[in-house]
Amino acid sequence: MSYPQGYLYQPPGSLALYSCPAYGASALAAPRSEELARSSSGSAFSPYPGSAAFTAQAATGFSSPLQYSSDPAGFPSYMGSPYDAHTTGMTGALSYHPYGSAAYPYQLNDPAYRKNATRDATATLKAWLQEHRKNPYPTKGEKIMLAIITKMTLTQVSTWFANARRRLKKENKMTWAPRNKSEDEDDDEGDGERVKEEQSEKAQDCNETSAEDEGISLHVDSLTDHSCSADSDGEKLPCRATDHLCESGSESKEKYDDDEDEEEGDEEDRVLPVKPATSSPLTGVEAPILNHQQDGSPRNSNKTSLDNGMSPSSQTPASKPKLWSLAEIATSDHKHSNLGSVLSSATSSAAHNPSYPSSSLLGRHIYYTSPFYSNYTNYGNFNALQSQGILRYSSAAVTANEGLNQTVLSTSSMHKHTSDSVRTASNQLDQHYRPTNFESKKDPSEVCTVGVQPYP
């Protein structure tokens, strides 16, 4: 490798690292002056016979791969002096093209290499094409021969023939029969046409397979939907068969309508049973599973309170039916403000909320003290009726019914007793599903003091 004219070449002796001592125990023990004197003849990384590293290796018995009898010259014999480029040696190095190599026959600056086809080259190709008008498909050997004659590459020759055939097709001068490309021929046009045809066929196949896959996926989705629906129905059936505790608001309403049609015939013979509140008509969220096995005594005591403690609203004319509306519940607090002394023991836990009187416990339906109702109104929860957010009928209903019995005894002279308890209970169930905005302004005197409201 040669260097340019103005390049300052430094011999290996001047590139020695004077600050880096040679490696080895003897080198460390050697005098500093001798090391500096010997370092001028060799580098620390390629030790020569005069360096300290070479003497250390020789002392330990290792032979150096660079065994010179004397100091080597700055340049080998085949290289000339860098400062005299025109002397003997590599005189032609400066004129050699740096991008050329022996493996590439046509150099970039070689006049034999033709970048663009000239008229002479195309004239040769046209002459061959004119002779082979009936079969303008040159073989591999013919292409190589034409490439050598025209000094073009095989790619250029193949491209020129493909363009010539395409041009003749457009000019309707096609004098040959189209044929398939043989194995030993390199036809660009045939390749392009076949690639296009194969791509179109593959696209059609992909469309068909995608349609089939979509059909299969749709079939699988439908099967999974049916199976999921069947599983969900199977899960819902035992809940519906055993009890009403897993029904939502709309389902319980529809089931209540069906049950009401069946029970209309024998309403006069038996008393309509009171069902626990299982879901909220406002939210549609499933209510928590209640401890309904311990509801026997509250329900039995509630029947007597229903017989004796019905409000005048159920006995008034039909122009003002009873309605459990939010406005009526709000006004019920003022009606029962005089019952605070009687119910002080039952509502002692609600005394922490000063905004609501202590007598509002019985003025409000027990169902509306559920955890779901406080999310949609401004009424707070009652800790006496809730234990960790779950409505407990086993303890709350008993306390409420005890207060109800006292209220009924104290106010029995003010109300008219009724013997038709079935009719009043059914009226309450029918009026329970009326819209809440119906008769928003209700007389405060028309308030029912019933404990557990029957709700399907």
Swiss-Prot record:
Instruction: List, as start-end ranges, the regions of compositional bias called Polar residues.
Output: 291-318
The record's function comment reads: Acts partially redundantly with other irx members in neural patterning. Required for formation of the posterior forebrain, midbrain, hindbrain, and to a lesser extent, spinal cord. Acts early in neural plate development to induce expression of some but not all proneural genes, and specify a neural precursor state. Also up-regulates repressors that prevent neuronal differentiation. Patterns the neuroectoderm in both the anterior/posterior and dorsal/ventral axes. Probably dispensable for pronephric kidney development.
InterPro entries from the UniProt entry: HD, Homeobox_CS, Homeodomain-like_sf, Iroquois_homeo, KN_HD
Q: What is one cellular component GO term in this UniProt entry?
A: nucleus
GO MF, one example:
DNA binding
Tell me where it resides.
Answer: Nucleus
Name any Gene Ontology BP term. Answer: positive regulation of neuron differentiation
- Specify the protein name: Iroquois-class homeodomain protein irx-2
Q: Where is the composition biased (Acidic residues)?
A: 257-269
The Swiss-Prot or TrEMBL record marks DNA binding at: 110-172
Region listing for Disordered, in residue ranges:
172-214, 246-320, 434-456
One short Pfam name that applies is: Homeobox_KN
Instruction: Tell me where on the tree of life, at the top rank, the source sits.
Output: Eukaryota
Question: Where does tissue-level expression of this protein occur?
Answer: Expressed in the neural plate in overlapping patterns with other irx members, which all share an anterior border of expression. Also expressed in the placodes. Broadly expressed in the tailbud rhombencephalon (hindbrain). Outside the nervous system and at tailbud stages, expressed in the developing otic vesicle, branchial arches, prospective heart region and pronephros.
List, as start-end ranges, the regions of compositional bias called Basic and acidic residues: 192-205, 246-256
Keywords from the named record? Developmental protein, Differentiation, DNA-binding, Homeobox, Neurogenesis, Nucleus, Transcription, Transcription regulation
The family this protein is said to belong to: Belongs to the TALE/IRO homeobox family.
What is the species listed in this Swiss-Prot or TrEMBL entry?
A: Xenopus tropicalis (Western clawed frog)
Which SMART domains does the record match to this protein?
A: HOX (SM00389), IRO (SM00548)
Q: Which gene encodes it?
A: irx2
